[in-house]
């Protein structure tokens, strides 16, 4: 399900980054080796009253000269209008209205998106009178705040979440598997979509996507129906700069959120990039099924073990998703496209798999005998019971004697045992541990 997107726009030095940090502060739980994209702190999840949304930080857009200020702000605002569900237009309450503020306001008044005017740096009640002048910008909803000391943030967040449509994330065709194509520009995502759309054996119906600029394709392939989500925002442009890339990634994250299977497309002539790692890390964190698709394989000189060597290189760089299948195709030559759908069907079945409690406990009992759990100060970890509580993705509830004894390495061992005994290729496994007395 796609989260609403909240963008903070405004000229430099009005406090956008400070507000961003305040909004996401309680949601930060990132380790240094976290593969997820959110480590960049350009776009992060925030929560208020159990409503989750993505906040986009445009705080890094600090122009180097007066000549490019207007151009940068215009671009920033256009991207916010295009991408966001709610726009926080931030101004400086101490400095007052500037010509750039007026220009941004003029652009925002023409959009149908929800716009909230945020007057920052109102640090004292005596400064409240400064707020009234900002009604000249033409916005009814004005919130005075002090981002640095959190004054007024509660009221602002109340207004933000009130803009979210409770039904806006409701998906039609809930029973149809949704496949999201992700990857860098120019790896062949659009070419693959076009190939699928032009295939005579496929029945295609264009449907309106729930994201702002994506067109989803409903494809019937050999009796199986899928919805392919094309991340249109990542299509190559003549120039990809910081602002455009930032919002493009937000569109991709939104597409991942509402998908079931994420297909990461890689250019065989370039290999795995840092962006690939981050985007796949986000899909992994969100519990999505995954496939790695290597395109342009026709351009690679073939030698003995070429494909195996390429797979090893991918596994080395994407070690956190060793369970994900790797498929090699050539969209241009129309080769091995069938293998992609074979893997999609297989991974989708794995994603929905449910295993009976009795079978699960038999497997875990044997695993414990083969490799006894760790102990600490004479107390050994005991696994009493395991049961599957969810599918898509599979989630397991494990009852143990002490949580602190369940080391990461032993959890990985349990996961590997499940993967060896059941077909979970392409699917992340999730675990919840609960303590229980003897």
Swiss-Prot record:
Q: Which BP terms does GO give this entry? A: ribosome biogenesis
- Keywords (A to Z) from UniProt: GTP-binding, Nucleotide-binding, Repeat, Ribosome biogenesis
Binding of GTP 1, residues: 10-17, 57-61, 120-123
Which parts of the sequence belong to the KH-like domain? 353-437
What Pfam families does UniProt report for this protein, alphabetically?
KH_dom-like, MMR_HSR1
- InterPro entries xrefs: G_ENGA, GTP-bd, GTPase_Der, KH_dom-like, KH_dom-like_a/b, P-loop_NTPase, Small_GTP-bd
Residue span(s) of domain EngA-type G: 4-168, 177-352
Q: Which domain of life is it from?
A: Bacteria
MF terms in GO = GTP binding; ribosome binding
Q: Where GTP 2 is bound, by residue?
A: 183-190, 230-234, 295-298
Family per UniProt?
Belongs to the TRAFAC class TrmE-Era-EngA-EngB-Septin-like GTPase superfamily. EngA (Der) GTPase family.
Task: Briefly state the protein's biological role.
Answer: GTPase that plays an essential role in the late steps of ribosome biogenesis.
Assembly, per entry: Associates with the 50S ribosomal subunit.
Family matches, as HAMAP family: GTPase_Der (MF_00195)
Listed name of the protein: GTPase Der
Q: Which organism is it from?
A: Finegoldia magna (strain ATCC 29328 / DSM 20472 / WAL 2508)
The beginning of the lineage is: Bacteria, Bacillati, Bacillota, Tissierellia, Tissierellales
